[in-house]
Amino acid sequence: MRVAAVSAHFGRDVEPCLAKIEAITADARVRGVDLLVFPDATIGGYLGGFGAVGATGMPPAFPADDPVFDRLAAAAGPTVVCLSWRESDAGRFFNSAVCLTGDGVLGRHRKVHQPVGEVAAYAAGDRFTAFDTPVGRLGMLVDYDKTFPEAARTLAGDGAQLLACLSAWPASLTDRAPRLAQDRQSRLFDLYDCARAAENQVVVVSANQTGTMGRLRFLGQSKVVGPGGDVLARTWAKAGLACADLDVAAEVSRSRLNLSHLRERRPEAYA
């Protein structure tokens, strides 16, 4: 199976975002990609900063049943595609992810963990649930969710062997490095991807935005991480696809052959 994480910029204008999603998906299908994970805020971009709305304004919002998702499902065809947008639901807004193919929606997730200031744009989700897909049982994390070990552990405990991490992760706002690869947030972004994969012995497909939005400069660094925490493919700070070929079930099973972290947990000692 071939899995891929997208590293690209998605701005405020919806139609160019949709066209870019369609073009990247078509290219990935030609390249034999079975699972394609896009960054956070794929439709309409992320915030331009934390706190005040700023000059970039709020991202556009769509309900979960908007016809735009029929268009994107048609573009996905046989490929399993994960992407993200600002969801509107009865006057509330969520940072949401959807997983779909040409047959329709396979699963959804609303971002649970919010950095300071994000409450101005989004309400918080309240659960982590894995679901079955043609490429295996999968769970989704949006951006800051992956900072918290319990989030990925909950999905792994629910049977997920693949974690799709959709991010709009920026460089540090307070201590910027001259190069993105040297930035403190770049190191943390990589650390979380590798740690969540290794501690749960799952495959992590981590996508991130590039470019800038308002005050935020996004890191890129999309990657595929194996269940031992090893990086199998990455884009570094550039736009592109991080692609890796692997038998997910076999790799996960092999990583758990001698040490099985989920089986050997002692939750009664953690209280």
Where are these regions (language model features)?
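Extreme N-terminal starter segment of soluble prokaryotic enzymes
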Residues: M1-A4
